[in-house]
Regions:
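Active-site-adjacent alpha-helix immediately C-terminal to a catalytic or transition-state-stabilizing loop
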Residues: 2, 62, 132-183
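Short coil-to-beta-strand
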Residues: 2-12, 104-107
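Histidine-centered catalytic micro-motifs
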Residues: 7-13, 150-155
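Active-site-proximal alpha-helix that buttresses catalytic centers in soluble enzyme cores
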Residues: 12-78
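Phosphate-handling substructures
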Residues: 28, 71-130
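Generic structural signal for well-ordered alpha-helical scaffold segments
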Residues: 38-45, 128, 132-140
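Short beta-strand scaffold positions
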Residues: 55-56, 129, 150-151
């Protein structure tokens, strides 16, 4: 039988509140982000029998995953495969700063995200290749397991589009709040 994946976006961070682009940069969870992760952990421990937890190696995802792991009594395995998209020159910038300094590229990112090339950043297709390879590896290694994947907004949406065999141009059709849980 196939594995079941529980794909989770990390809890709220300080940069989420400020509206800064995170990418590979990091911002710690806020008190609300910790509370979100604790609520999710409680719900998951009551409703699901989880076998493994894998997390992006970026701090905000690790913080979220460790709260889940402590509640579920499962050690968290960290991996670069679940990292957020690298936003290059945009990391740490506010959306208004990006619109001002990179207007043409930002317009492309919003209208044709599958074609956009952020300066010194990754593309959606790079993220798709990375996460598809990771899911394939998990499916070869495990069978009929319940696996939590703690990751990031863009990465979650790319994964979901991939599971749905949908194009990356549809990335904005999927919304992901902090600690959103997607079961596939």
């Amino acid at each position: 039988m196939a594995n079941t994946f529980y794909i989770v976006r990390h809890g709220q961070t300080n940069w989420n509140i400020l509206g800064k682009t995170q990418g590979h940069g990091n911002s710690d969870l806020t008190a609300k982000g910790i509370e979100q992760a604790e609520e999710l952990a409680k719900s998951m421990s009551e409703n699901y029998n989880i076998d493994y937890i894998f997390s992006s190696d970026l701090g905000r995802a690790v913080q979220t995953a460790e709260i889940l792991g402590n509640s579920l009594n499962i050690e968290v395995e960290k991996t670069e495969a679940l990292r957020e998209m690298g936003f290059g020159k945009w990391e740490g910038l506010l959306i208004d700063e990006i619109k001002s300094e990179y207007a043409d590229i930002y317009t492309s990112w919003r209208n044709e995200p599958h074609l956009a090339q952020i300066p010194e950043g990754e593309t959606l297709h790079i993220i798709k290749e990375r996460v598809d390879k990771f899911i394939d590896e998990l499916n070869k290694k495990f069978n009929n397991k319940h696996i939590v994947l703690v990751t990031h907004s863009v990465t979650v949406r790319v994964m979901l589009l991939s599971f749905l065999n949908s194009g990356m141009e549809n990335i904005y059709r999927i919304k992901q709040d902090n600690t959103a849980l997607n079961i596939v």
